[in-house]
Amino acid sequence: MDAYVALEGGHVVEARGRSPGTSRGELVFTTAYTGYEESLTDPSYEEQVLTFSYPLIGNYGVREERFESDRVHPRAVVARELTDDVAEWLADEGVPAVDHIDTRDLVTDIREGGAMKCGIAVGDDATAEDALAELDACKGMSEHEDIGAQVSVAEPVVHEGDDDGAYADADVALIDCGAKGSIVDSLVARGADVHVLPYDATEADVDAVDPDLLFISNGPGDPANFEAAEALVDTYVGETPIAGICLGQQVVARALGGTTEKMDFGHRGVNQPVRDLETNRVVMTTQNHGYTVGDPGDALDVTQVNVNDDTPEGLDSDELGVITRQYHPEANPGPNDSLDFFDDVLGLTESRTTVAPADD
């Protein structure tokens, strides 16, 4: 099949088509060399075109038990070489895919110019003009104002905790902004009953759970577009312990007076080093985000930073009962160095705080 990738600025790259269709999205890359099944089913890649920097994708097949959600989320996939297994899977999912492209050059372009819009056209009759038409119709990530609706549950779902878990009496209200399955699994394995609520859940929805912990999940896009989750943090902070991962950290920071900003090309991979400012310990982490906390505000302490660029990786408040992480402690894919995060946040449920944040 013919295939064309149109990059922001109008440059068109020819490739080999592996899965037919036309699509568009923000072109990003991951440096992960394993875990392609988990990456492709991660809801945080919604409305993006995912480029794999590792040259061969698919060399250990496709197994559903590794999926992080029930579908592929990137709008299209770019690789140096895709195996037939992955190409067929993407075709079944209706996701265009191309390979035989110089991904090293493409990744360099993204690193130097930042994440960019792109359009893709794949098919026996595909043309460069088709890809350019997709590029012209492409929106920026911040313009997807209701992206949460594309990745969230529509109705509450309850996952019962393991009876022998250490926190078998805990109820967690997890606001699903695009949650990975492994986050839910990590909480359930520790005994917590996880009540997954829609991204636009109301105070009444949360009150119906009467949670011991409010958890804001990961998700795609601009945290400014998750105003309902931000409002929940503002309502419950100081009354109910709060945790967040990835987008969840950004939402919590915004609710407590902080700011967020778009990164040039983000952090996406399984080898991002993070340093704990108290212990000076460095752990390797899995990350997938294009936005970060700029100014964390006065209510939260920066407890961990990225070794490469000093961006905030951990924001905590002992007084308010808040623990958030920009990276993915649940990994999948990636290292398991930070699984104790789930014990730390569930530990907050043993003595619920009642301290209110100070007024600005």
List each model region and its residues:
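RNA-binding accessory domains that recognize and position tRNA/RNA substrates
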Residues: 1-171, 177-184, 188-189, 198-200, ...
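Cysteine-nucleophile active-site neighborhood
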Residues: 208, 213-290, 334-342, 348-352
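Residues that mark the start of a beta-strand
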Residues: 169-173, 193, 241, 284, ...
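Catalytic beta-strand/loop cores that center a nucleophilic Ser/Cys/Thr
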Residues: 280-319, 359
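Active-site glycine-centered loops adjacent to acidic/histidine catalytic or metal-binding residues
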Residues: 10, 102, 246, 289, ...
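A glycine-centered loop/beta-turn motif at secondary-structure junctions
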Residues: 315-357
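Short acidic loop-to-helix transition motifs that present clustered carboxylates
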Residues: 197-204, 222
